[in-house]
Protein backbone atom coordinates (compact mmCIF):
# COMPACT_ATOMS: atom_id res chain seq x y z
CA UNK A 1 0.00 0.00 0.00
CA UNK A 2 1.38 3.44 -0.96
CA UNK A 3 2.01 6.17 1.62
CA UNK A 4 -1.02 8.07 0.32
CA UNK A 5 -3.29 5.05 0.60
CA UNK A 6 -2.03 4.46 4.14
CA UNK A 7 -2.43 8.10 5.09
CA UNK A 8 -6.05 8.10 3.86
CA UNK A 9 -7.03 4.76 5.39
CA UNK A 10 -8.85 6.58 8.18
CA UNK A 11 -11.04 8.27 5.57
CA UNK A 12 -11.98 4.93 4.07
CA UNK A 13 -12.86 3.67 7.53
CA UNK A 14 -15.06 6.73 8.12
CA UNK A 15 -16.56 6.23 4.62
CA UNK A 16 -18.01 9.64 3.75
CA UNK A 17 -18.10 13.29 4.72
CA UNK A 18 -19.62 16.66 3.92
CA UNK A 19 -18.41 19.85 2.26
CA UNK A 20 -19.59 23.26 3.51
CA UNK A 21 -19.23 26.58 1.69
CA UNK A 22 -19.52 28.91 4.71
CA UNK A 23 -18.65 32.14 2.92
CA UNK A 24 -19.29 35.78 3.76
CA UNK A 25 -20.71 36.46 0.30
CA UNK A 26 -23.37 33.81 0.96
CA UNK A 27 -24.27 33.67 4.65
CA UNK A 28 -23.96 37.44 5.12
CA UNK A 29 -25.81 38.34 1.92
CA UNK A 30 -29.45 39.22 2.72
CA UNK A 31 -30.55 38.25 -0.80
CA UNK A 32 -29.34 34.67 -0.30
CA UNK A 33 -31.67 32.25 1.48
CA UNK A 34 -28.86 30.81 3.59
CA UNK A 35 -28.27 34.24 5.21
CA UNK A 36 -31.76 34.16 6.74
CA UNK A 37 -32.17 37.74 5.49
CA UNK A 38 -29.35 39.12 7.62
CA UNK A 39 -26.40 41.40 6.92
CA UNK A 40 -24.09 42.22 9.83
CA UNK A 41 -20.40 42.43 10.55
CA UNK A 42 -18.51 39.27 9.58
CA UNK A 43 -17.81 38.53 13.24
CA UNK A 44 -21.50 38.75 14.12
CA UNK A 45 -22.38 36.47 11.23
CA UNK A 46 -19.91 33.84 12.42
CA UNK A 47 -21.18 34.04 15.99
CA UNK A 48 -24.71 33.30 14.73
CA UNK A 49 -23.55 29.80 13.72
CA UNK A 50 -24.29 27.11 16.31
CA UNK A 51 -21.27 24.82 15.90
CA UNK A 52 -22.49 22.30 18.49
CA UNK A 53 -25.88 21.89 16.84
CA UNK A 54 -24.23 21.56 13.43
CA UNK A 55 -21.89 18.87 14.77
CA UNK A 56 -24.80 16.99 16.34
CA UNK A 57 -26.58 16.89 12.98
CA UNK A 58 -23.49 15.42 11.29
CA UNK A 59 -23.14 12.87 14.08
CA UNK A 60 -26.79 11.91 13.68
CA UNK A 61 -26.09 11.18 10.01
CA UNK A 62 -22.81 9.36 10.69
CA UNK A 63 -20.54 11.71 8.71
CA UNK A 64 -16.84 11.03 9.10
CA UNK A 65 -15.44 14.42 8.16
CA UNK A 66 -16.31 17.98 7.23
CA UNK A 67 -14.46 20.04 4.61
CA UNK A 68 -14.88 23.72 5.54
CA UNK A 69 -14.06 26.69 3.30
CA UNK A 70 -11.59 29.17 4.79
CA UNK A 71 -12.46 31.65 2.01
CA UNK A 72 -13.18 31.87 -1.70
CA UNK A 73 -12.03 34.80 -3.84
CA UNK A 74 -13.13 37.62 -1.49
CA UNK A 75 -11.09 39.16 1.34
CA UNK A 76 -13.08 37.49 4.11
CA UNK A 77 -11.35 34.68 5.99
CA UNK A 78 -12.84 32.29 8.55
CA UNK A 79 -10.42 32.92 11.41
CA UNK A 80 -7.79 35.45 12.56
CA UNK A 81 -4.52 35.44 10.63
CA UNK A 82 -1.71 37.87 11.47
CA UNK A 83 0.18 36.99 8.29
CA UNK A 84 -2.81 37.93 6.14
CA UNK A 85 -3.31 41.22 7.99
CA UNK A 86 0.38 42.12 7.74
CA UNK A 87 0.49 41.48 3.98
CA UNK A 88 -2.79 43.20 3.11
CA UNK A 89 -2.83 46.02 5.65
CA UNK A 90 -6.31 45.10 6.84
CA UNK A 91 -7.00 45.55 10.56
CA UNK A 92 -8.38 42.64 12.61
CA UNK A 93 -12.08 42.29 11.88
CA UNK A 94 -11.93 43.92 8.43
CA UNK A 95 -11.08 40.74 6.52
CA UNK A 96 -9.98 38.18 9.09
CA UNK A 97 -12.55 38.05 11.91
CA UNK A 98 -11.62 38.49 15.54
CA UNK A 99 -13.56 35.35 16.45
CA UNK A 100 -11.85 32.05 15.65
CA UNK A 101 -14.58 30.14 13.85
CA UNK A 102 -12.22 27.31 12.91
CA UNK A 103 -11.32 26.70 16.55
CA UNK A 104 -15.00 26.68 17.50
CA UNK A 105 -15.71 24.16 14.77
CA UNK A 106 -12.79 21.96 15.81
CA UNK A 107 -14.06 21.82 19.39
CA UNK A 108 -17.62 20.98 18.35
CA UNK A 109 -16.67 18.31 15.82
CA UNK A 110 -14.09 16.80 18.16
CA UNK A 111 -16.82 16.14 20.73
CA UNK A 112 -18.61 13.84 18.27
CA UNK A 113 -15.54 12.27 16.63
CA UNK A 114 -15.78 14.04 13.27
CA UNK A 115 -12.60 15.15 11.50
CA UNK A 116 -12.12 18.66 10.08
CA UNK A 117 -10.43 19.39 6.76
CA UNK A 118 -9.93 22.91 5.42
CA UNK A 119 -10.64 24.26 1.96
CA UNK A 120 -7.97 26.61 0.60
CA UNK A 121 -7.53 28.12 -2.85
CA UNK A 122 -4.73 28.49 -5.36
CA UNK A 123 -5.82 31.92 -6.59
CA UNK A 124 -6.21 33.82 -3.32
CA UNK A 125 -8.50 36.79 -2.57
CA UNK A 126 -8.44 37.90 -6.19
CA UNK A 127 -11.84 39.65 -6.12
CA UNK A 128 -10.74 42.18 -3.50
CA UNK A 129 -8.65 45.04 -4.97
CA UNK A 130 -6.59 45.70 -1.83
CA UNK A 131 -5.83 42.05 -1.09
CA UNK A 132 -5.27 41.22 -4.75
CA UNK A 133 -2.63 43.94 -5.06
CA UNK A 134 -0.95 43.01 -1.77
CA UNK A 135 -0.67 39.31 -2.61
CA UNK A 136 -0.15 39.74 -6.36
CA UNK A 137 -2.88 37.27 -7.26
CA UNK A 138 -3.71 38.68 -10.67
CA UNK A 139 -3.82 35.41 -12.63
CA UNK A 140 -4.26 33.53 -14.77
CA UNK A 141 -0.96 31.90 -13.71
CA UNK A 142 0.48 32.23 -10.20
CA UNK A 143 3.65 34.22 -9.58
CA UNK A 144 6.22 32.74 -7.16
CA UNK A 145 5.89 35.79 -4.89
CA UNK A 146 2.14 35.24 -4.58
CA UNK A 147 2.56 31.55 -3.78
CA UNK A 148 5.13 32.33 -1.08
CA UNK A 149 2.81 34.86 0.57
CA UNK A 150 -0.36 32.79 0.23
CA UNK A 151 1.32 29.63 1.51
CA UNK A 152 2.48 31.62 4.55
CA UNK A 153 -1.17 32.33 5.38
CA UNK A 154 -1.95 28.60 5.26
CA UNK A 155 1.13 27.83 7.35
CA UNK A 156 -0.06 30.09 10.16
CA UNK A 157 -3.36 28.23 10.31
CA UNK A 158 -1.65 24.85 10.14
CA UNK A 159 0.72 25.66 12.99
CA UNK A 160 -2.09 27.09 15.11
CA UNK A 161 -4.42 24.10 14.87
CA UNK A 162 -1.84 21.32 14.53
CA UNK A 163 -3.16 17.78 14.37
CA UNK A 164 -6.75 18.99 14.75
CA UNK A 165 -6.75 19.75 11.02
CA UNK A 166 -6.74 16.34 9.37
CA UNK A 167 -6.38 17.53 5.80
CA UNK A 168 -6.63 20.19 3.10
CA UNK A 169 -8.63 20.41 -0.14
CA UNK A 170 -7.17 23.09 -2.40
CA UNK A 171 -9.21 24.61 -5.21
CA UNK A 172 -8.25 26.65 -8.28
CA UNK A 173 -5.04 24.77 -9.12
CA UNK A 174 -5.65 24.50 -12.85
CA UNK A 175 -2.78 26.17 -14.70
CA UNK A 176 0.71 27.44 -14.02
CA UNK A 177 1.41 25.34 -10.95
CA UNK A 178 4.71 23.47 -11.05
CA UNK A 179 5.86 20.79 -8.59
CA UNK A 180 8.11 23.41 -6.99
CA UNK A 181 5.21 25.78 -6.35
CA UNK A 182 2.95 22.96 -5.19
CA UNK A 183 5.56 21.89 -2.65
CA UNK A 184 5.30 25.26 -0.90
CA UNK A 185 1.63 24.61 -0.20
CA UNK A 186 2.20 21.00 0.81
CA UNK A 187 4.91 22.06 3.26
CA UNK A 188 2.61 24.75 4.68
CA UNK A 189 -0.36 22.39 5.03
CA UNK A 190 1.77 19.83 6.87
CA UNK A 191 3.69 22.31 9.04
CA UNK A 192 1.38 21.63 11.98
CA UNK A 193 0.38 18.08 11.11
CA UNK A 194 2.84 15.97 9.08
CA UNK A 195 0.08 13.40 8.50
CA UNK A 196 -2.44 15.83 7.02
CA UNK A 197 -4.02 14.51 3.81
CA UNK A 198 -4.00 16.73 0.72
CA UNK A 199 -6.03 17.01 -2.48
CA UNK A 200 -5.54 19.70 -5.14
CA UNK A 201 -8.27 20.44 -7.64
CA UNK A 202 -6.32 20.47 -10.91
CA UNK A 203 -8.98 19.46 -13.41
CA UNK A 204 -9.70 21.54 -16.50
CA UNK A 205 -11.85 24.60 -16.02
CA UNK A 206 -15.22 24.56 -17.79
CA UNK A 207 -17.59 27.39 -18.65
CA UNK A 208 -21.35 27.29 -18.00
CA UNK A 209 -21.93 25.48 -21.30
CA UNK A 210 -19.49 22.68 -20.51
CA UNK A 211 -16.76 23.89 -22.86
CA UNK A 212 -13.20 23.20 -21.71
CA UNK A 213 -11.39 26.49 -21.08
CA UNK A 214 -8.07 25.18 -19.78
CA UNK A 215 -6.41 21.82 -20.06
CA UNK A 216 -5.82 19.86 -16.87
CA UNK A 217 -2.24 19.92 -15.65
CA UNK A 218 -0.49 16.73 -14.50
CA UNK A 219 -1.42 15.39 -11.07
CA UNK A 220 0.10 16.91 -7.95
CA UNK A 221 2.94 14.77 -6.53
CA UNK A 222 1.81 15.64 -3.00
CA UNK A 223 -1.84 14.57 -3.27
CA UNK A 224 -3.13 11.76 -1.07
CA UNK A 225 -6.65 11.56 -2.51
CA UNK A 226 -8.22 12.80 -5.70
CA UNK A 227 -10.02 16.14 -5.52
CA UNK A 228 -12.90 14.39 -7.25
CA UNK A 229 -15.05 17.42 -8.13
CA UNK A 230 -17.78 16.50 -10.58
CA UNK A 231 -21.30 17.65 -11.47
CA UNK A 232 -23.10 14.30 -11.52
CA UNK A 233 -22.48 11.39 -9.14
CA UNK A 234 -22.35 7.86 -10.50
CA UNK A 235 -18.70 7.05 -11.17
CA UNK A 236 -17.14 4.20 -9.20
CA UNK A 237 -13.54 3.41 -8.23
CA UNK A 238 -11.42 0.50 -9.33
CA UNK A 239 -9.81 -1.04 -6.24
CA UNK A 240 -10.03 2.25 -4.35
CA UNK A 241 -7.13 3.96 -6.11
CA UNK A 242 -6.76 6.71 -8.67
CA UNK A 243 -3.37 6.62 -10.36
CA UNK A 244 -1.73 10.00 -11.02
CA UNK A 245 1.79 10.07 -12.43
CA UNK A 246 2.16 6.35 -11.78
CA UNK A 247 1.43 6.83 -8.07
CA UNK A 248 -1.73 5.39 -6.47
CA UNK A 249 -3.77 7.75 -4.31
CA UNK A 250 -7.18 7.29 -2.68
CA UNK A 251 -10.12 7.50 -5.10
CA UNK A 252 -12.49 10.26 -3.99
CA UNK A 253 -15.56 11.89 -5.51
CA UNK A 254 -17.12 15.22 -4.55
CA UNK A 255 -20.38 16.72 -5.75
CA UNK A 256 -23.33 18.71 -4.49
CA UNK A 257 -26.45 17.23 -2.98
CA UNK A 258 -28.57 20.33 -3.63
CA UNK A 259 -30.85 21.01 -6.56
CA UNK A 260 -29.37 23.46 -9.09
CA UNK A 261 -31.38 26.10 -10.88
CA UNK A 262 -32.92 24.85 -14.11
CA UNK A 263 -30.69 27.04 -16.28
CA UNK A 264 -27.35 25.93 -14.80
CA UNK A 265 -26.96 22.27 -13.92
CA UNK A 266 -23.58 22.81 -12.25
CA UNK A 267 -24.99 25.44 -9.89
CA UNK A 268 -26.14 23.23 -7.04
CA UNK A 269 -23.24 23.92 -4.67
CA UNK A 270 -24.68 24.90 -1.29
CA UNK A 271 -28.25 24.81 -2.59
CA UNK A 272 -31.20 23.26 -0.70
CA UNK A 273 -33.13 20.14 -1.66
CA UNK A 274 -31.71 16.87 -2.96
CA UNK A 275 -31.06 15.63 -6.46
CA UNK A 276 -30.90 12.07 -5.18
CA UNK A 277 -33.25 9.84 -3.21
CA UNK A 278 -32.12 8.34 0.10
CA UNK A 279 -32.18 4.84 -1.40
CA UNK A 280 -30.07 5.76 -4.41
CA UNK A 281 -27.53 7.58 -2.25
CA UNK A 282 -27.25 4.68 0.19
CA UNK A 283 -26.55 2.19 -2.61
CA UNK A 284 -24.03 4.52 -4.24
CA UNK A 285 -22.12 5.32 -1.03
CA UNK A 286 -22.06 1.65 -0.08
CA UNK A 287 -20.71 0.68 -3.51
CA UNK A 288 -17.95 3.29 -3.28
CA UNK A 289 -16.92 2.07 0.17
CA UNK A 290 -16.87 -1.58 -0.89
CA UNK A 291 -14.54 -0.63 -3.74
CA UNK A 292 -12.14 1.24 -1.45
CA UNK A 293 -13.16 4.79 -2.37
CA UNK A 294 -14.51 7.74 -0.38
CA UNK A 295 -17.34 10.22 -0.93
CA UNK A 296 -17.89 13.87 0.04
CA UNK A 297 -21.25 15.60 -0.38
CA UNK A 298 -21.61 19.36 -0.55
CA UNK A 299 -24.58 20.41 1.59
CA UNK A 300 -26.76 23.45 2.29
CA UNK A 301 -26.16 24.93 5.75
CA UNK A 302 -27.89 28.09 6.96
CA UNK A 303 -26.18 30.97 8.71
CA UNK A 304 -27.28 29.53 12.07
CA UNK A 305 -25.74 26.09 11.41
CA UNK A 306 -28.92 24.20 10.49
CA UNK A 307 -28.66 21.73 7.60
CA UNK A 308 -31.43 21.65 4.99
CA UNK A 309 -34.01 19.11 6.20
CA UNK A 310 -34.50 17.40 2.83
CA UNK A 311 -30.76 16.81 2.71
CA UNK A 312 -30.76 15.52 6.28
CA UNK A 313 -33.28 12.86 5.23
CA UNK A 314 -30.75 11.66 2.66
CA UNK A 315 -27.73 11.91 4.95
CA UNK A 316 -29.35 9.96 7.79
CA UNK A 317 -29.57 6.78 5.72
CA UNK A 318 -25.80 6.87 5.17
CA UNK A 319 -25.15 6.13 8.84
CA UNK A 320 -25.55 2.41 8.14
CA UNK A 321 -23.27 2.27 5.07
Language model regions located:
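Mature catalytic domains of secreted/periplasmic carbohydrate-active enzymes
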Residues: 1-321
Amino acid sequence: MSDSMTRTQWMHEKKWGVFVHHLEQIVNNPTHSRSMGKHTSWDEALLDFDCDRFADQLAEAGAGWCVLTIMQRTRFMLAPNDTYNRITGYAPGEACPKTDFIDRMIRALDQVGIALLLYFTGDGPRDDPQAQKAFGCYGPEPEPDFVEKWAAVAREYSLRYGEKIRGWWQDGMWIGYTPELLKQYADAFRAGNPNAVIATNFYGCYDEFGELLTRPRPGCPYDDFSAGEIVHLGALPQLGAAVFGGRPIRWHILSFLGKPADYFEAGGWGMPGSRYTPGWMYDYADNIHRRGGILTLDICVRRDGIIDEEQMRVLRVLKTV
